[in-house]
């Protein structure tokens, strides 16, 4: 089963072609890691999956991003786009909790916008904090401001905020790049515990991280999809010489 079917996806920023005919299936309830050097199109690819690309006035797309049988790139109605983003959550590179809000209110924010009953909101908040491996650290201080948390805790709070919406897909754009090794490992453990429940697309520039957590890996270079395979196969037996060279430079010989 696939969560997304991407077909001949092209993205233009003005005259610059940022993605060049990407065709890729994202398997359902697995972790797909996206690797490649800076500027290769990894983040642009995520923006197409969550339709953030539509917020960029000078961006133009071609091709298809099929989700639940529909090409979501054709959505124009704001209600359809918002509904899609509820099903496809996103965690960004830099932790971005609302610092003026309490820990609890950060997680509850999107649910309140939906007009959900407060009793159900409370259940969802606790559920999301537990799934994000944060509940045991904050349960007795949910009224504290989010700014009181460490960087790693703030990122897990952002994961909880996304999970509270019960998304079918969670997109993660280099979510550990600002974190120390201990916080990074906790995020990785959280992500691996979530697979099986949620489809995860995880962008990373850290090849050891991709190897640790990915079920499948896609290698992007200069806006092209060079190769995609099971993570084990891609790292140990790459089929394209460009993949092999990149892995050997960044990760060591396979």
Swiss-Prot record:
GO terms for biological process: phosphate ion transmembrane transport. Transmembrane segments: none annotated. ATP binds at residues 36-43. InterPro entries: AAA+_ATPase (IPR003593), ABC_transporter-like_ATP-bd (IPR003439), ABC_transporter-like_CS (IPR017871), P-loop_NTPase (IPR027417), PstB-like (IPR005670). Belongs to the ABC transporter superfamily. Phosphate importer (TC 3.A.1.7) family. GO terms for cellular component: plasma membrane. CDD domains: ABC_PstB_phosphate_transporter. The gene is pstB. It is found in: Cell membrane. The lineage of its organism: Archaea, Methanobacteriati, Methanobacteriota, Methanomada group, Methanopyri. Keywords: ATP-binding, Cell membrane, Membrane, Nucleotide-binding, Phosphate transport, Translocase, Transport. PROSITE patterns: ABC_TRANSPORTER_1, ABC_TRANSPORTER_2, PSTB. Part of the ABC transporter complex PstSACB involved in phosphate import. Responsible for energy coupling to the transport system. Its EC number is 7.3.2.1. GO terms for molecular function: ATP binding; ATP hydrolysis activity; ATPase-coupled phosphate ion transmembrane transporter activity. Residues 4-247 form the ABC transporter domain. This is Phosphate import ATP-binding protein PstB. It catalyses: phosphate(out) + ATP + H2O = ADP + 2 phosphate(in) + H(+). It comes from the Archaea.
């Amino acid at each position: 089963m696939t969560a997304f079917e991407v077909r001949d996806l092209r993205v233009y920023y003005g005259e610059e072609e940022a993605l060049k005919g990407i065709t890729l299936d994202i398997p359902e309830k697995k972790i797909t890691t996206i690797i490649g050097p800076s500027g290769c199109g990894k983040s642009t690819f995520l923006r197409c999956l969550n339709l953030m690309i539509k917020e960029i006035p000078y961006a133009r797309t071609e091709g298809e991003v099929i989700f639940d049988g529909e090409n979501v790139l054709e959505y124009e109605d704001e209600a359809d786009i918002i509904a899609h983003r509820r099903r496809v959550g996103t965690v960004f590179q830099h932790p971005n909790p609302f610092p003026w809000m309490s820990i609890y209110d950060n997680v509850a924010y999107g649910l309140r916008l939906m007009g959900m009953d407060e009793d159900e909101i409370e259940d969802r908040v606790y559920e999301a904090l537990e799934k994000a491996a944060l509940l045991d650290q904050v349960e007795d201080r949910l009224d504290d401001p989010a700014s009181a948390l460490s960087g790693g805790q703030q990122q897990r709070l952002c994961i909880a905020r996304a999970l509270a919406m019960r998304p079918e897909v969670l997109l993660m754009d280099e979510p550990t790049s600002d974190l120390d090794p201990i916080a990074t490992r906790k995020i990785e453990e959280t992500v691996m515990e979530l697979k099986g429940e949620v489809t995860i697309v995880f962008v990373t520039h850290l090849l050891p991280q991709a190897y640790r957590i990915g079920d499948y890996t896609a290698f992007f270079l200069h806006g092209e999809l060079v190769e995609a395979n099971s993570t084990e196969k891609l790292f140990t037996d790459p089929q394209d010489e460009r993949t092999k060279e990149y892995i050997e430079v960044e990760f060591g010989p396979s």
